Amino acid sequence: MWDVMMWPIVACLLLPGLLVYLGMHVVRRGIIFVDIAMAQMASLGVCFAVMKHMDLDSPLTFWISLGFTLLAAALFAFTGKRTGEVPQEAIIGIAYVVAAAASVILLSYSTEGDEQIKNMLIGNILLVTKQEIFRTLALFVGVGVFHWFARKRFMMLSFAPEEAVAIGVSVKLWDFLFYATFGLVVTSFVQIVGVLLVFTYLIVPAVCGILTARRFGVRLAIGVVLSLAGGVTGLMVSFYQDLPSGAAIVCVFGVLLVLTGIVSIFIKEKPRRVDA
C-alpha cells in the first residue's frame, strides 16, 4: 500500500493549508463559486494545450493555464460586487459555465476527450509525483509569504470592505492581487486533483471552521486539521474500497461537514462579529 499511497498522502498533508486560508477569504467575501470558476478557467487552458497536442506536464502548458486564470482574475477584480447592480456571483457563474462549455468543445478535437473531461473534474491524485508535490509546495510557500506581508490589506478587504474604501485603499488593485495569487494556487493544484477537489478543499474546511469558532486563527486551525484528516481518510477509503480517490475524498469532506454542523449546534454561540 505504501508504495502506491505515499506521495498522495504527502500531498494531502503538505498542500491544503494555504487553500483553507484562501477559502476563509472566499467564504467571507460571499463569492463561493469563484474557486470553481477559477479552477475551470485553469482547466480551459489545459484543454487548449491538449487541443494543440502539447505535453500536459510541460512548463508551456502551465503558463497557458495560468494565463487563462489571470484573465479570470482581472475579470472578477474589475467587476467587484461593491458597485453596480449585477451581483458578482452572476458574473462568476457565467464565467464558469462558458469555460466549462469551451472546455468540452476543445476536448471534442481530442481522441481522448471523454477521459480528459473526467480527469479535469476529479483528477487523479494517485498519480502525483514527488516533483509535482515539492514544486507546488514551493509555489504555495511563495504565495503564502506574499499574503503574510499583505495580510492587513487582504483582511480589511474581506472583513471590513467599507473601511477599506473609506481610507482610500485601491480596492480593484488589491482585489486583482488577491485573485491573481488565488489563481496561481488554483492553477497548480487543479492539475493534480481536478476541479471538484479544488472546490472541496477551498470551501468545506473553511465552512467547518466558521461553524465552530469565532476567531479567524482558530477557524483556520480547525479548517487545516479537518482538511488533513479528510484528505488522508478519503485516500484510505478509496484504497481499501477500490473507489476513485478524488470522489472518495469529496464524499468524506461532505460527511465531515455534516458532523461539524451537528457539533456546532452544541459548542458555538452566535457571534456579533468576527475577531480577526
Language-model features and meaning:
Residues A39-F48, I94-L106, L127, V171-T181, ...:
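Small-residue-rich segments of transmembrane alpha-helices in multi-pass membrane proteins
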Residues M24-A37, C47-E112, G209-A221, S238-Q241, ...:
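Short loop segments and helix-boundary regions at transmembrane helix junctions
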Residues I36, L243-A276:
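Cytosolic-side transmembrane-helix boundaries in multi-pass membrane proteins
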Residues T83-R153:
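Transmembrane helix-bundle core of multi-pass membrane transporters
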Residues L18-L22, I36-K52, A72, A99, ...:
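Hydrophobic alpha-helical segments within and immediately flanking transmembrane helices
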Residues M1-G17, Q88:
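Membrane-interfacial amphipathic/re-entrant helices at transmembrane-helix boundaries
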Residues L196-A247:
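Transmembrane alpha-helical segments in multi-pass inner-membrane proteins
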